[in-house]
């Protein structure tokens, strides 16, 4: 017998749980099905939310024949068979799993069929199609993002399976404690496939009572779904979403949010990404407002790397809280980015002659190094002279902020020097 998650796959668009922003009657996919006019599309979202099942349900809601292939497993010959069927029948829906893994040869073969509409592609992927899918394919498809399933929607899927006598567990007399149901719904981490298969394991592995009832307790549920599933693909879209939220929470001084995202990265065992991002934050977002934050973060990272997980969470948490509650300044990154923008725009100019290297024979004959004023020979180690090239001689890249004691002190010095020019 096939697993419960497979048996409970929706066959019609009305059976789809969740994704109402796409499949409801008044939403885009719902309207396409009602109008009997499907366009090629890419469905993307996290693992276990039913992308391929939804694709099958969409195709099954039409009168058009459909075929399922996998971009990795199936070869070009398999696609040629689908194309031949499309030529004979006029149109075929191709459900293509892992569409982001489509190689160039298969892409080139599919493109003309997508162009003339003989093949309607419904691709499924966990990867962000804007990053992972060839632009030629993207331009011929609609891209729809599927939303993670909430615990309430997971419970809806479980209840449906418990009462379905044909495909589900409806032929069994099952009672399930509320706490057990909550564990399945929350413990699967949004993966309905995992929740359904855990429920089936619980039902099939639990002995009937004297009255023929199968009673599922929290203990049984925890045994069948032992660890809270946490989906975190280090190369996936969600990984960069978490890192982005992590940095933005620290930048926004929200220690609680930052600790939440840190915990997600820790749970994924992603020490390398945490370390890199914390160092970037220390210099990009804290910057000159508290320059000692950088070395302290580095020390925390080195400690974390030395002790490893689970203890690594302690120095990392210390560093995150300090960064959250430190004064913030991005004056340095703004300054260097403005300087780089000038360089890339061709605003360069020649190095002033008095600053050019004069440590070789004949340099003075070329006018190099002449009239250079050595600052250490002057009061307070400063003397007025031009350092920037002529086209930029009055340019000010650095614009100090006063969000920390250190940069406030730097600003006083900087302002004083600017006035003396």
From Swiss-Prot:
UniProt subcellular location: Cytoplasm, Nucleoid
E.C. number(s) listed in UniProt: 3.6.4.-
Top-level EC class: hydrolase
Regulation: ssDNA-dependent ATP hydrolysis is stimulated by single-stranded binding protein SsbA but not by SsbB; in the presence of SsbB, ssDNA secondary structure is removed and RarA's ATPase activity is decreased. The C-terminal 9 residues of SsbA are sufficient to stimulate ATPase activity.
Alphabetical list of Gene3D superfamilies matching this protein: 1.10.8.60, 1.20.272.10, DNA polymerase III clamp loader subunits, C-terminal domain, P-loop containing nucleotide triphosphate hydrolases
GO BP terms in the entry: DNA recombination; DNA synthesis involved in DNA repair; DNA-templated DNA replication
Cellular component annotations (GO), alphabetically ordered: nucleoid
Keywords: ATP-binding, Cytoplasm, DNA-binding, Hydrolase, Nucleotide-binding
A GO molecular-function descriptor: enzyme activator activity
Phenotype caused by lack of the gene: Full RecA induction does not occur in response to DNA damaging agents; RecA 'threads' do not form in response to H(2)O(2) treatment. Increased sensitivity to DNA damaging agents H(2)O(2) and mitomycin C. Double dnaB temperature-sensitive-rarA deletion strains die at 42 degrees Celsius. Double dnaC temperature-sensitive-rarA deletion strains are very growth impaired at 42 degrees Celsius. Double dnaD temperature-sensitive-rarA deletion strains grow less well at 39 degrees Celsius. No changes in sensitivity to DNA damaging agents methyl methanesulfonate (MMS) or 4-nitroquinolone-1-oxide (4NQO).
Major subcellular site: cytoplasm
Positions contributing to ATP binding: 45-52
SUPFAM superfamilies membership: P-loop containing nucleoside triphosphate hydrolases, post-AAA+ oligomerization domain-like
Subunit structure: Homotetramer. Interacts with single-stranded binding protein SsbA. May interact with PriA.
Summary of the function given for this chain in its UniProt record: Plays a role in recombination-dependent DNA replication. Positively affects the formation of RecA threads during response to DNA damage, directly or indirectly counteracting the negative RecA modulators RecX and RecU. Stabilizes a RecA-ssDNA complex. In vitro, in the presence of SsbA, inhibits PriA-dependent DNA replication restart of both leading and lagging strands; elongation is insensitive to RarA. Plays a role in response to DNA damage, localizes to the replication fork but also to DNA elsewhere in the cell. Probably required for repair of single-stranded nicks generated by H(2)O(2).
Family: Belongs to the AAA ATPase family. RarA/MGS1/WRNIP1 subfamily.
Protein name (Swiss-Prot/TrEMBL): Replication-associated recombination protein A
